[in-house]
Amino acid sequence: NRVVAAFDTDEGMWGGRLALEYRTAGGLWYALASRGYKAGGVNSDSAVPDDQRRFDTESMWNYELGVKTRLLDDRIDLRAAVFVQDRDDVQTDQALVLPIVGDACPCEFVDYQTNAAAARSYGLEMEMNWRVNRSLEAFASLGLLETEFVDFLNFSHVEADPDTGTPFDMDGRELPQAPSYQVALGAVWEFARRWTLSGEFEAKDDFLFSSRHQVGSNAYELVHLRLGYRTPRWDFAVFVRNLTDATIRTRGFGSFGNDPRDGYAVEPYYQFGAPRTFGVSAAYAF
């Protein structure tokens, strides 16, 4: 039997931006409020339950205060902003884990979209470039972020119970892909004619990969170095990335089993970032 579901395809959506700017001899101060949206839609896979076939339009209000200025006789460029974001009907990526044959894994994924009632975020972003002298330039950036779901009952979370229809309550839990801090520091030193030495340090807090499970990235720190030689047309370099050979999780899954040796028990699976990497490069400008 064929079941046809009808949905109203007419919907009014609106967005906009209002900003106030104050310019001084030293820079620009601003305040803004903006509203954006992400259109809703339909989950077309027939495996998705009828009551979750449609997902609603998401909207977001963003409020921001910031400054862009120059300091120390224009040798420092500074940009900083604080923000608050209120999101309603947050679209979240979900997935059904369905056995391919019988009632046990191996399994397949059916991806679909659903809505959390709301989410709240606030944070700070800062960037700085400092021309220390004719031979040395430094840079730094900082990002601080706090996020949380509001009133989100997740029926596809690994800790939900599909047999009884009991969801996993994610109210107050952090959003995925939202580390609480990100830091970058670096410098470029021209120590001889046409020769440069640069280094960069970056750090990121731990964060969840998905709203379906508790698997996430570990907090990590990375160090990169580069020695370069430049002519009017050629640019040569030797470099090392991830100098300390840190282990970085870039992606992960934690809601299914994939190994028949342990009876397809549910366990995490990870993809990792590049290990310590040495290399050389050459570029020619035509």
Predicted regions: what they are:
Residues 16, 29-31, 63, 76-80, ...:
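Transmembrane beta-strands of outer-membrane beta-barrel proteins
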Residues 18-22, 65-69, 126-130, 140, ...:
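Residues on the lipid-exposed face of transmembrane beta-strands in outer-membrane beta-barrel proteins
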Residues 84-86, 108-211, 281-285:
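Gram-negative outer-membrane beta-barrel transporters
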Residues 14-18, 51, 61-65, 112, ...:
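Hydrophobic, lipid-facing positions within transmembrane beta-strands of outer-membrane proteins
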